[in-house]
Amino acid sequence: MANEGSDPLLQYMISPRLKKPPQLLFPLPEDNEVAIPMPMTPSEFKERLIFGPFSCSPRDSSHFIDSMKQPSPSSSSTAVNNPFSDSSTLDPLLPPPPPQPEPWLSDQTSSHCQGHALHRSKTAPAMAVINDLHHPIRQKDPTETSRSVVRQAFALLVVYLSLGVLIYWLNRDHYVVNQTHPVVDGLYFCIVTMCTIGYGDITPNSVVTKLFSIMFVLVGFGFIDILLSGMVSYVLDLQESYMLDSAKRRDEPEKRRSYIIDVKKGRMRIRLKVALALGVVVLCIAVGVGIMHFIEEIGWLDSFYLSVMSVTTVGYGDRAFKTLPGRLFAAIWLLVSTLAVARAFLYLAEARVDKRNRERAKKVLCETMSVSQFFAADIDNNGCVSKAEYVIYKLKEMEKITDKDILPISKQFDKLDRCSNGKITLLDLLEGGSGD
C-alpha cells in the first residue's frame, strides 16, 4: 500500500472529481497522440465535397458509432471542462473532433477504416451538384426545336406562295399564258419559278411582272434551302429514328442488322440513306408518269419524258401541264420531287465523302510513325509524345480536325486554368463560378 499515493489509476477511482483540468498544451505527435484534427488535404477536401463525410474517416464522426455508443459521465464532464471541445471555435471547413469509440466497437470498425482509399465511380451521382449551383444548364428538347423550325418553314412558305399568287392575280393580264384559273395558274407559276424548272408556258411580258419574277426567283432559292434544312430534314430524321427503333426491337441477328444500322455510331448507314432517297425519286417519277398519262392524256413515252424533265428540274418547255387538274397536281408534285432530288444528291455527295474519309483513316492507322512525324506530333516540345498528342496528330492526318478547331478549345482551357499549371482543378471551377 506504499504505492497507493503514486498510483494514478487508484487515485482516479477514489477521487474522480479531483482530476486536474486538461492541459492547454497538447502532446507532440511523436507520442502517437493528436489532440486536434489535422487539416484536410486537397484530395480529401474534394472527396468530402463530392461524397460528403465518410463514416470511417478519422476526420469525421461515425454515425454508426454514435448510435451504438452510450454517453458516459466521464466523457461528458471532460467535454464540459475542455475549453477546446466546442466545434464552433474551429474552422467551419474542418470537421468536429471524432469521438472515442468503445473498445468493443473499435475492433469492428478498424478493419473498415484501415487502408481507406475511395475513388468516385463514374456512374455514381454526386451528393453536391456543384456545377448546377454555379452554372445552371437549361437543356432544350431537340424535338421541340425541330418542330419549331418546321412550323416556321411552313408559315414562310404559305406567306411566300400567297404573296406570289396575289401579285399574279392582280397582273394576270400581263402574262402570256393558256389560262385555266387565276389562282391555280398563279400557284403553278410560283412553284415552277421557285423550283427553277421554267417550262415557259407562263411568261411575263411587262416591266412589273418581269421585276416580280426576278425577285421571286432570288427569294425562292432561300426558301428551297429553308425547306431542305427544316421540313425535309425533320421528316427524314423521324423516318430514321423509326427505322432504328424497329430494327432494334426485332429479334434479328446482329450481322443482318449491321447492314442497316451502324452500331458504333448509332445511325443508319449512308448507303441505306442513298437507296431510300433514290427510291423516293423513282416513286415521284412513277407517280408523275401515271398522272400525266391519265389527266393530261399524253402517251406513255411522253409522260415518262415530261416526268423525268420535271423531277430533274430541266424543263425544256416543249411539254408542260395545260389542264387545271394537271397544274393543281404539279403545284404539289413538283415541290416534293424537287426536294427529294436535292436530298438524294446531298446523300450521294455524303456517301462519297464518307468513303474517302474511311479510306484515309485506314491508311493513316496502318502506317508507322517516322522521325519527322514524331517531331510534328510533339506539341509541347518535351522530347516525348503523349497519348493525347498522338491522338490529336492522327486526327489531323485524317483531316477530321484542324488547328482552327483546336485553337478555341485551347483558349477555353486557358480561361479555366487559373493557375496556369496545365490542369483544371475543382478549386478553379469553384473560383470561376464565384467570379462569374
Swiss-Prot record:
Keywords: Calcium, Chloroplast, Ion channel, Ion transport, Membrane, Metal-binding, Plastid, Potassium, Potassium channel, Potassium transport, Repeat, Thylakoid, Transmembrane, Transmembrane helix, Transport, Vacuole. Disruption phenotype: RNAi-mediated knockdown of the protein causes no effects on germination or on plants grown under normal conditions, but decreases the rosette size, enhances the accumulation of anthocyans and desorganizes the photosynthetic membranes when the plants are grown under high light. No effect on photosynthetic performance. InterPro entries: 2pore_dom_K_chnl, EF-hand-dom_pair, EF_Hand_1_Ca_BS, K_chnl_dom. The keyword Glycoprotein does not apply. PROSITE patterns: EF_HAND_1. Residues 365-400, 404-436 form the EF-hand domain. Ca(2+) 2 binds at residues 417, 421, 423, 428. Residues 71-92 have a biased composition (Low complexity). Inhibited by barium, but not by tetraethylammonium. Expressed in roots, cotyledons, stems, hypocotyls, leaves and flowers. Detected in root tips and in mesophyll cells and guard cells of the leaves. It is found in: Vacuole membrane; Plastid, Chloroplast thylakoid membrane. One of its GO terms (molecular function) is potassium channel activity. GO terms for cellular component: chloroplast stromal thylakoid; plant-type vacuole membrane; potassium channel complex; vacuole. GO terms for biological process: cellular response to electrical stimulus; nonphotochemical quenching; potassium ion export across plasma membrane; potassium ion import across plasma membrane; potassium ion transmembrane transport; thylakoid membrane organization. The chain crosses the membrane at residues 149-169, 212-232, 275-295, 328-348. Ca(2+) 1 binds at residues 378, 380, 382, 384, 389. Coiled coil: none annotated. It is a multi-pass membrane protein. Homodimer. Belongs to the two pore domain potassium channel (TC 1.A.1.7) family. This is Two-pore potassium channel 3. It comes from Arabidopsis thaliana (Mouse-ear cress).
